[in-house]
From Swiss-Prot:
GO biological processes: proton motive force-driven mitochondrial ATP synthesis
GO CC list: mitochondrial inner membrane; proton-transporting ATP synthase complex
InterPro entries associated with the record: ATP_synth_OSCP/delta_N_sf (IPR026015), ATPase_OSCP/d_CS (IPR020781), ATPase_OSCP/dsu (IPR000711)
Name of the protein in its database record: ATP synthase subunit 5, mitochondrial
Summary of the function given for this chain in its UniProt record: Mitochondrial membrane ATP synthase (F(1)F(0) ATP synthase or Complex V) produces ATP from ADP in the presence of a proton gradient across the membrane which is generated by electron transport complexes of the respiratory chain. F-type ATPases consist of two structural domains, F(1) - containing the extramembraneous catalytic core and F(0) - containing the membrane proton channel, linked together by a central stalk and a peripheral stalk. During catalysis, ATP synthesis in the catalytic domain of F(1) is coupled via a rotary mechanism of the central stalk subunits to proton translocation.
PROSITE patterns, per database record: ATPASE_DELTA (PS00389)
PANTHER family the UniProt entry points to: ATP SYNTHASE DELTA CHAIN
Main subcellular location of this protein, as a coarse class: mitochondrion
Source organism per UniProt: Neurospora crassa (strain ATCC 24698 / 74-OR23-1A / CBS 708.71 / DSM 1257 / FGSC 987)
Keywords: ATP synthesis, Hydrogen ion transport, Ion transport, Membrane, Mitochondrion, Mitochondrion inner membrane, Transit peptide, Transport
Length: 220
């Protein structure tokens, strides 16, 4: 876990090569992202994707960004540090250097991307940019995200059975592959809530109780 002291210690301002990154992204007009993203975080994610394609470094970039996502998930305090509005140029340089060191980034595209965020005072966007970049990669790989919400964690056997059943259904297009995630929410009491792309199948106990309560209230 990164400490605040480690991130904010005095450091030399990095030679960021921001212009190199911007030029690579701008020159990628012939690269068409698999999906259109909106918002400032979507703009940065798309620029990173197109720059990575242009420099033939898409998979290494995806691996590095995934590592950054894991780091951010394990260290919630890091996000608040990134959002600090009073960071000096030296602080930003130190943060970028520590992020690169922590995830073992040697990819120039990612280095320049992080430097660009720092240069533009947008390091606070990093968590959402990572999420948006993941959307781009899933679309590029032909993946359909399936989120299974349960009251308790599901074992791999159960998840595999669900994946096999849904993969054969009309919910998943031909040639697509499922990317399964299990989320835990005790509020659903029992059962499952399955989200496939933009579709939701609510088989939770809480949903059934809500429907029953509605029927009872209408009958009274």
């Amino acid at each position: 876990m990164l400490s605040r002291q480690a991130l904010l210690r005095p450091a030399r301002v990095l030679n960021t090569q921001v212009r190199t990154y911007a030029a690579a992204a701008a020159a990628s007009s012939k690269v068409k992202p698999p999906v259109t993203l909106f918002g400032l975080d979507g703009t940065y994610a798309t620029a990173l994707y197109t720059a990575a394609v242009k420099t033939s470094a898409l998979e290494p970039t995806a691996k590095a960004i995934s590592s950054l996502g894991n780091l951010l998930a394990k260290d919630p305090k890091l996000a608040s540090i990134l959002e600090t509005p009073t960071l000096s140029p030296a602080d930003k340089s130190a943060i970028v250097a520590e992020l690169q060191k922590s995830v073992g980034v040697s990819n120039e595209t990612v280095k320049n991307f992080l430097a660009t965020l720092a240069e533009n005072n947008r390091l606070g966007l990093l968590p959402s940019v990572v999420a948006k970049f993941s959307e781009l990669m899933s679309a590029a790989r032909g993946e359909v995200e399936m989120v299974v919400t349960s009251a308790q964690p599901l074992d791999n056997k159960t998840l595999n059975r669900l994946e096999s059943a849904v993969a054969k259904s009309p919910y998943v297009g031909s040639g697509k592959k499922l990317k399964v995630t299990n989320k835990v929410n005790a509020d659903i009491i029992g059962g499952l809530v399955v989200e496939i792309g933009e579709r939701t199948i609510d088989l939770s106990v809480s949903s059934k109780i809500a429907k029953m309560n509605k029927l009872l209230s209408e009958a009274l």
